[in-house]
């Protein structure tokens, strides 16, 4: 894990960060979620075209390539891609990237500490909703954090074949998770609303976390549907059978969830189980399905 020098924020950077603390995150997020579900015909199509132009969204790779094909903004935002738009790495000993976006940070978990950004760390225990048993499985392991910008494909896929063991919904803040805020809001990913998914794999346990953010109106999984809303004030755990008819088995590259606006995906791997591709450093663009790591365990 490479440590970068911590720069003292400027006055305007401090103002920008302070605004995040007073910004009405939940009301604005609820309003955004409601607006994104409205069917306003030509108005909706105009908004989609404007958004796509502003953020340089590549609609040509989507199954529906015209703004007028979408009834709501959310339908556009979680648009499925054309078949083979994201080829899945076929090496049986390789993991694939779970999402389009950019690497926020990646590297080794130092005991139980993960690097959030320049000068900021957070712990496995706080990230995993104080589940000490789960946290112990990933001490001295590896992690990768992927930031999904507004222009990106917002469905999240599996890096490997896996069986679901547990899902935890964690209520929390809705800070923006862009790279600037990641550098200036302590414990950002351990404070924000999130959905923690623990899986069994051939190399041991693996966790994939969907982290919410401002205007991330909802997160969903393929096995449970929309997780939020409704939003609760308590941590909620769901346990799953790992065999039998009710077991949830997912294949490498298979869709596992989606964001309706936002956000960030964090993956955790146990000690001495994988070796990341050397180029996957902070700021590097990612494409779902490309090689993430080699299984070494």
UniProtKB/Swiss-Prot annotation:
It is a peripheral membrane protein. InterPro entries: PS_Dcarbxylase, PSD-B, PSD_type1_pro. Its main location: membrane. It holds the Pfam family PS_Dcarbxylase. The record marks 262-263 as: Cleavage (non-hydrolytic). GO terms for molecular function: phosphatidylserine decarboxylase activity. Pathway: Phospholipid metabolism; phosphatidylethanolamine biosynthesis; phosphatidylethanolamine from CDP-diacylglycerol: step 2/2. Its cofactor is pyruvate. Heterodimer of a large membrane-associated beta subunit and a small pyruvoyl-containing alpha subunit. Belongs to the phosphatidylserine decarboxylase family. PSD-B subfamily. Prokaryotic type I sub-subfamily. This is Phosphatidylserine decarboxylase proenzyme.
């Amino acid at each position: 894990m490479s440590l970068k020098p911590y720069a003292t924020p400027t006055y305007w950077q401090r103002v920008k960060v302070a605004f995040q603390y007073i910004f009405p995150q939940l009301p604005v997020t609820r309003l955004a979620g409601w607006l994104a579900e409205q069917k306003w015909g030509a108005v909706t199509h105009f908004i989609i075209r404007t958004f796509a132009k502003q953020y340089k969204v590549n609609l040509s790779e989507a199954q529906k390539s015209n703004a007028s094909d979408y009834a709501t903004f959310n339908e556009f935002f979680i648009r499925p891609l054309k078949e083979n738009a994201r080829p899945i790495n076929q090496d049986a000993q390789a993991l694939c990237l779970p999402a389009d976006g950019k690497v926020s940070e990646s590297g080794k978990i130092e005991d139980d500490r993960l690097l959030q950004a320049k000068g900021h760390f957070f712990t496995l225990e706080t990230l995993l909703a104080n589940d000490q048993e789960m946290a112990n499985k990933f001490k001295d392991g590896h992690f990768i954090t992927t930031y999904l910008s507004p222009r990106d494909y917002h469905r999240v896929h599996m890096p490997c074949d896996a069986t679901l063991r547990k899902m935890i919904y964690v209520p929390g803040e809705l800070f923006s998770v862009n790279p600037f805020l990641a550098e200036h809001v302590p414990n950002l990913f351990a404070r924000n609303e999130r959905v923690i998914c623990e899986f069994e794999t051939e190399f041991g346990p693996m966790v994939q976390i969907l982290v919410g953010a401002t205007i991330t109106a909802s997160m969903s999984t393929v096995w449970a549907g929309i997780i939020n809303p409704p939003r609760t004030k308590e941590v909620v755990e769901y346990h799953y059978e790992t065999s039998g008819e009710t077991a949830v088995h997912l294949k490498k590259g298979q869709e596992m969830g989606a964001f309706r606006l936002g956000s960030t995906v964090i993956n955790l791997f146990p000690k001495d189980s994988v070796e990341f591709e050397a180029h996957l450093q902070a700021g590097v663009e990612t494409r779902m399905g490309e090689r993430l790591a080699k299984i070494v365990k």
